[in-house]
Structure formats: structure tokens, C-alpha cells
């Protein structure tokens, strides 16, 4: 009996977004944990300028506070012809490079998590992990995510939306109160996010947010705990919600919130997994996370972030491809229900293949 060949998995990482380095860190962890008996890994990097290039498995972690970055080698291109799906061409050398069976797009932020690269994969006919074009695009835009969730009857955090470098008027300020959080509408990893405790600091916060996006959200601070729930789709289409994780705080965050350095550099974030919530509330949050996943039409995976107080809760964000670094919440909350990192990846890849 002939042994089955390992599935060839292209792990695509880097990209043009401000979350380039986070993507590299996630990809390094993913490649390290893929079962070599089941999967043959083909690393593909995307430079900050957007060139697809030969990747590598080493050097994708933080060293002495320095963030990893994709270096340009030979340029690569994915075939867009479904008849030759999975074929990758070496543009620099004008020759065939390799073929792959499935793609894991470990791309956070614009040009990766927003439906653009998913459209490329749809054109090529290649199976890929994660949400499709529409769910990725909606999930990337926090304004439209909330509009969709509200239409489905799900509770969301209030917000004001600004575009074109506009600022808040007095009525909006009165509605929001202080403090507020200012964030790019289509960003992640807390990049470009500021906490504003005095209105005279608003313009500086808006300037920072507008550097990342031409649409900005202003949200009031909501008293209560930050609670995160992961959702995993299995090959048969069934959905599993993780236990909730409660963010306990950061040890060194000068910004006063769960910021980029706390998430990826300082390792200053601690979490209670499972969150110390009642059985009833835990079950309700897990169900709401699944409902949010379905409302977006997501696939494969998501992480749903809640604000939870003593008497109520609301959804803050839905992330259609959450961070996969070794200290990211998504792998941790599933480890707490017995789904280890390697099994998590195996499930995601098999789900992508079953969907194709």
C-alpha cells in the first residue's frame, strides 16, 4: 500500500500592512507546529512593498526587541488559472518553482485580511484557510462589522465614525464622554490606537489613527472586563467555541490599554483562562461568538472580543484571522479545551480542503 504524500502547504506571510511583523511571527510559529508527517511546508513571504518572494522558516521571531521582516529573494507568482491551481512560478528565473495543495494566508490587516488576497485565491481556485472575500472585507472594517451584528440582533459597543481627517463636534463629544479610544477602522494589533482622557489630546490621537486609515472610530471606554472567545470550524461544518479568556491587564503598558508592545514584545499581558464567569454567562458568550461568526459568514476561525460588566456585555470586535504567535490568545483558549496548536492547524487545513 502506497503511503499518502504529505499535503503541500504554502504559508504566506508578511505583506503591505502595518501588521507585517506580527504576520511574520505568527507564520514562524505555524510552520514550527505543522506536523511534518502530514504537511510539507512551502514558505512564501510578501515584502512591505508587496512583492511575493521565497520565504524561509528561520528568523521569524523577535530578537532583542527587533521585529522580523520579509527580505526580498527571487520573486514568485501564483497561477491564476484554475486549470493549474496551486502552481507557483519563479518570476526572477523564468521557471517553475513548485506546486501547493492549500494556502495558509497568515496575513493580518489590509492587503491580506481584508478580502483582497482571498479574491486572488478564489480566482486561482486554490483552497485556503480562513474567511472568504466578503466575510474578510466586512470583518476588517469595524464600522460595518458592527452594523451587520446589530442587524442580527447582537449587542455591540457604541461608536462614532470619522472620515477625511474630520474631528468630533460638541454633540458627539457629549454623547461619548471621556475617556475614549481612537482607532483606525480597518486596523489591528492595536496599531494606531490611542486612549484619550482629555479632549485637548484628541487631535494628536486622530493624527496617529489617520496615518493608518482614512476612516477612524471613536469609542467610549466601557467599564468591565475584556473577554475573548475563539471559534473553530471543523471539516464537517460544525462550530466549536473556546472557553472565554479574561484579559487581566498589562504589566508595563504606559498607554493604559492592551497595546501592541504588550501583545507582542513585553509579554506583559496576563489572562485568566477560562475566565472566572458564571456557567450561564460563559455559555451565553460562547453562543454569541458562534452567532457573530455566522453573521459575518466567516469560515475556519475567528476570535470575538467582548466587553463584560456585572450586568451586561457587548461585542467589541470580530477578528477573522487572529494572531497565531506563541503568546496569542486564540491558540491559548483552544489549548484550554484540549485542542493543541498542531491539532488546531490540522483542523483548519482539513476544513479548507473539505470546503474546496
From Swiss-Prot:
Transmembrane segments: none annotated. Its main location: cytoplasm. Mg(2+) 2 binds at residues 317, 319. Signal peptide: none annotated. Its EC number is 6.3.2.4. It is an enzyme of class 6 (ligase). One of its GO terms (biological process) is regulation of cell shape. The keyword Nucleotide-binding applies. ATP binds at residues 173-228. Pfam families: Dala_Dala_lig_C, Dala_Dala_lig_N. Pathway: Cell wall biogenesis; peptidoglycan biosynthesis. It catalyses: 2 D-alanine + ATP = D-alanyl-D-alanine + ADP + phosphate + H(+). The keyword Manganese applies. Residues 146-350 form the ATP-grasp domain. Keywords: ATP-binding, Cell shape, Cell wall biogenesis/degradation, Cytoplasm, Ligase, Magnesium, Manganese, Metal-binding, Nucleotide-binding, Peptidoglycan synthesis. It is found in: Cytoplasm. GO terms for molecular function: ATP binding; D-alanine-D-alanine ligase activity; metal ion binding. SUPFAM superfamilies: Glutathione synthetase ATP-binding domain-like, PreATP-grasp domain. Its cofactor is Mg(2+); Mn(2+). Binds 2 magnesium or manganese ions per subunit. One of its GO terms (cellular component) is cytosol. Belongs to the D-alanine--D-alanine ligase family. Cell wall formation. NCBIfam families: D_ala_D_alaTIGR, PRK01966.1-4. This is D-alanine--D-alanine ligase.
Amino acid at each position: 500500500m502506497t503511503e499518502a504524500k504529505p499535503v503541500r502547504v504554502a504559508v504566506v506571510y508578511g505583506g503591505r500592512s502595518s501588521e507585517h511583523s506580527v504576520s511574520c511571527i505568527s507564520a514562524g510559529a505555524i510552520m514550527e507546529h505543522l506536523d511534518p508527517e502530514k504537511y510539507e511546508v512551502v514558505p512564501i513571504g510578501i515584502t512591505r512593498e508587496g512583492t511575493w518572494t521565497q520565504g524561509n522558516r528561520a528568523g521569524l521571531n523577535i530578537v532583542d526587541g527587533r521585529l522580523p521582516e520579509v527580505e526580498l529573494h527571487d520573486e514568485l507568482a501564483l497561477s491564476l488559472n484554475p486549470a493549474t491551481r496551486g502552481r507557483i512560478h519563479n518570476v526572477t528565473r523564468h521557471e517553475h518553482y513548485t506546486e501547493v495543495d492549500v494556502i495558509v494566508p497568515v496575513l493580518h490587516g489590509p492587503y491580506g485580511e481584508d478580502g483582497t488576497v482571498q479574491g486572488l485565491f478564489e480566482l486561482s481556485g486554490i483552497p485556503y484557510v480562513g474567511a472568504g472575500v466578503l466575510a474578510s472585507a466586512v470583518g476588517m472594517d469595524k464600522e460595518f462589522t458592527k452594523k451587520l451584528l446589530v442587524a442580527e440582533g447582537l449587542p455591540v459597543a457604541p461608536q462614532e465614525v470619522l472620515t477625511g481627517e474630520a474631528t468630533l463636534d460638541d454633540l458627539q463629544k457629549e454623547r461619548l464622554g471621556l475617556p475614549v479610544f481612537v482607532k483606525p477602522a480597518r486596523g489591528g494589533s492595536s496599531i494606531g490606537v490611542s486612549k484619550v482622557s482629555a479632549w485637548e489630546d484628541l487631535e494628536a490621537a486622530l493624527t496617529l489613527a489617520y496615518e493608518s486609515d482614512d476612516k477612524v472610530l471613536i469609542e467610549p471606554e466601557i467599564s468591565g472586563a475584556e473577554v475573548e472567545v475563539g471559534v473553530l470550524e471543523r471539516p464537517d461544518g460544525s462550530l466549536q467555541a473556546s472557553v472565554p479568556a479574561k484579559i487581566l491587564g498589562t504589566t508595563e503598558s504606559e498607554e493604559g490599554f492592551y497595546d501592541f508592545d504588550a501583545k507582542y514584545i513585553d509579554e506583559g499581558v496576563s489572562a485568566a483562562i477560562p475566565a472566572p464567569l458564571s456557567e450561564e454567562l460563559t455559555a451565553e458568550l460562547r453562543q454569541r461568538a458562534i452567532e457573530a461568526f455566522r453573521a459575518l459568514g466567516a469560515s475556519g476561525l475567528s476570535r470575538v472580543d467582548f466587553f463584560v460588566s456585572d450586568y451586561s456585555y457587548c461585542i467589541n470586535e470580530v477578528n477573522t484571522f487572529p494572531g497565531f504567535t506563541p503568546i496569542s490568545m486564540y491558540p491559548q483558549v483552544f489549548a484550554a479545551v484540549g485542542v493543541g496548536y498542531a491539532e488546531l492547524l490540522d483542523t483548519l487545513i482539513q476544513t479548507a480542503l473539505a470546503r474546496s
